[in-house]
Regions:
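Nucleic-acid substrate recognition interfaces
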Residues: 1-388
Length: 388
């Protein structure tokens, strides 16, 4: 999403900042009431303070989103989850996070050769920015949405790491319009540190996503964060630069995960895969002898967020994701079944029976055999997938 002029960008920032201010004021009020034992629903009506800048519909939408966050918080408490009350958009040191929510009937979105989006503006800024009473802020939109059914609330945000404005449009799609698997094949994934994903399918295809090059800048950023933390005064635990590096690191990781998941799911869909088995790493995540592997597994691979992305993307294609235990898959020889005398060194796997192979690909193949009851014939070399 791009403003059409410097003036439009300034107005967009003003709208996003006002929305963040509204969210933070309401959140502060409700948090104080919550910790004082009072009802959070008795908070001040902040809509009137912001309707002049945002317009009535947008101000109400931000308040409604805040209320949804509190209802989710209370529901989690009732389920016994260890959770915290809704937080703020930004903080005092770094400033507010520029975000807003636009009601589903308040934004015309035209997709074409020059896609555009129009969002409402309150009356107060219109004279300053040369807008008429009925005018809206017009923005250029890049990309084409996959779905075009009933549109939901629009989420706008500013990404300070990439210095870009973004837009997210949830769409309600009937089950009849979602893709269905082309066949009833299965796939098994070995999620790891050096190879982010090793995959084997019942059709005999194997895919390997190498994470070493992607991990290198992640590791360098982590080391720079540690260096800057060592220079802080004793009474401080962070700085604007450190927090920005954390956000940069997370954004790069999330981008890599999104690209990997999308690429993998599209390949599996083309192979006719209907079910994907993923190893349960709960026990692995509880600890590992190597601090470097721990860093990769916990922070870079971000297993749980990876699974969430995989399940959400797979759902678009009608593919089911199942989490299963993967005991002995990294030690078992796919040729003879030996577990005790096999050896592994990095990506290489050996068995006394004479078998040699790729450790992670063999693990995914063995895992697939455990879950799908089949040991498919695979090619001599898996397709290494390189993501930009």
């Amino acid at each position: 999403m791009r403003p059409l002029s410097t003036q439009d960008e300034q107005l967009l920032r003003e709208l996003l900042d006002a929305s963040a201010s509204l969210w933070n004021e309401l959140t502060y009020d409700r948090r104080q009431q919550f910790f004082d034992g009072d009802s959070v629903w008795d908070a001040t009506d902040y809509r009137r303070q912001y309707v002049g800048v945002l317009g009535s519909a947008t101000a109400q939408q931000v308040i409604r989103k805040n209320s949804e966050a509190w209802r989710s918080f209370f529901a989690a408490l009732e389920d016994g989850e260890d959770t915290a009350p809704p937080g703020y958009w930004g903080n005092e040191n770094d400033g507010r996070e520029l975000r807003t929510h636009i009601r589903n009937d308040q934004y015309p979105l035209e997709i074409g050769e020059r896609s555009r989006l129009e969002i409402p503006v309150g009356n107060d800024p219109k004279d300053e920015y040369g807008l008429g009473y009925h005018d809206r802020l017009r923005l250029e939109v890049c990309g084409a949405p996959k779905w075009d059914d009933e549109q939901d609330r629009l989420d706008l945000y500013y990404d300070e790491v990439d210095d870009t404005f973004g837009v997210i449009q949830p769409v309600t799609v009937p089950d009849s319009r979602q893709d269905s698997p082309l066949a009833d094949e299965a796939a098994a994934l070995d999620v790891g540190a050096n190879n982010l994903v090793a995959c084997t399918t019942t059709t005999g295809q194997q895919y390997r996503y190498d994470g070493r090059k992607l991990f290198r800048p992640f590791r360098e950023t982590t080391e720079e964060i540690a260096r800057l933390q060592s220079l802080l005064r004793e009474e401080r635990d962070s700085s604007r630069r450190i927090r920005r590096l954390y956000r940069t690191r997370t954004r790069r990781r999330d981008h890599a995960q999104n690209a990997l998941v999308r690429d993998l799911v599209e390949r599996l869909y083309d192979e006719g895969v209907a079910t994907v088995y993923v190893g349960d790493l709960t026990d692995v995540l509880s600890g590992h002898w190597s601090a470097r592997v721990n860093e990769k597994t916990h922070q870079f691979c971000a297993y749980r967020s990876f699974i969430d992305r995989l399940a959400t993307t797979a759902e678009e294609y009608g593919i089911t994701v199942e989490i299963r235990p993967e005991a002995y898959t990294t030690a078992e020889c796919p040729a003879c079944g030996e577990r005790e005398k096999t050896e592994r060194d990095g990506d290489e796997f050996w068995c006394p029976c004479g078998y040699e192979g790729h450790a992670d690909l063999d693990a995914s193949r063995t895992f697939l055999g455990q879950q799908a009851g089949t040991n498919p014939e695979v090619g001599s070399m898996a397709r290494p997938v390189r993501l930009k």
